[in-house]
């Protein structure tokens, strides 16, 4: 057996990989979390720490300077980063998703130009959502135009993680001459191009991920940075953007849920009521609330690993990853709601002290984002319900859910 084949068939040591990421989180990311939230500071230092150890290129093939790991390793990393700082984890997930989309659909020139700089700390992200289509972020009303061999982009994107901070954007808009809002194409847009105008991000939670509005005002993109072919956006969305985004998003909220539970357990074990000489952990009602959260968190872990392995299997077989769309959406729904429940329980059991500025109220605010991030849990439940009763999802038709 060749060395290359042996390496391809080798199973990564996932616990060693987890420990590697956890060290970065403990040494760099978690200590920055409070400042990231309080000041709304973009977590560039955290992303640089991940880049220096190759984790920003977790899915990038080794021949382009990445680590060439699998979706299981990525999901583990997203959990661990989410445990330390959900803002950083969301930036990380969008970055990994953007570079994976280029790895899957880019040509050799694009991979060389856009993937190699990731090892030095270049940050990518998606730029898709528009206000006019709300939570249906795959619908666009902006439209690219041609100018010779170049493209001119004019769009107002409502939510773009790392807005104004990313080195490049995987940008979605309607194809020139498109007849419907879902005839979309993708472009790789250099973050330093003239005409890119980021707005302000001042939100309830995940305040460091800079998911603000961004305007593209006559941004000129060379034809060589069209990703895939004109009109290929549906395929890219279904099998490039959505799978890695959804497994990463759910993993982020799994990590946030674990952080809330761990902090709450530490607090109730250490806090003593001197009047009755009892720890908070001596009260049955406290233990029951924490136990309920623990059970929910444990229910997510094997599901996460199973989905990540299935993504790897589909990719290895050359099959479209859209086959896992609904299971990934279901995972996203449950992970987001478990995180919100965990943060609420942590706030409940810590009482007035949890309500003060600190990790408990911060996670309470941060975890609300998971429920509304696209596809919002309301929209996602409608997809699942339609599938259950045999109705078409109609994702790509005007008026569809």
Outline where the language-model segments fall.
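Short, contiguous pre-domain boundary segments
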Residues: 1-10
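Generic structural signal for well-ordered, non-transmembrane alpha-helical segments
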Residues: 19, 255, 291-298, 329, ...
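C-terminal helix-coil-helix/basic helical segment that borders enzyme active sites and/or dimer interfaces
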Residues: 30-38, 298-334, 344-355
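Glycine-rich flavin
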Residues: 34, 38-161, 180, 388
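A short core secondary-structure module
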Residues: 156-197
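Glycine-rich phosphate/pyrophosphate-binding beta-alpha loops
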Residues: 158-163, 244-249, 370-377
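Glycine-rich beta->alpha junctions and the first turn(s) of the following alpha-helix
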Residues: 201-298
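Glycine-rich phosphate/cofactor-binding loops in nucleotide/flavin-utilizing enzymes
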Residues: 352-401
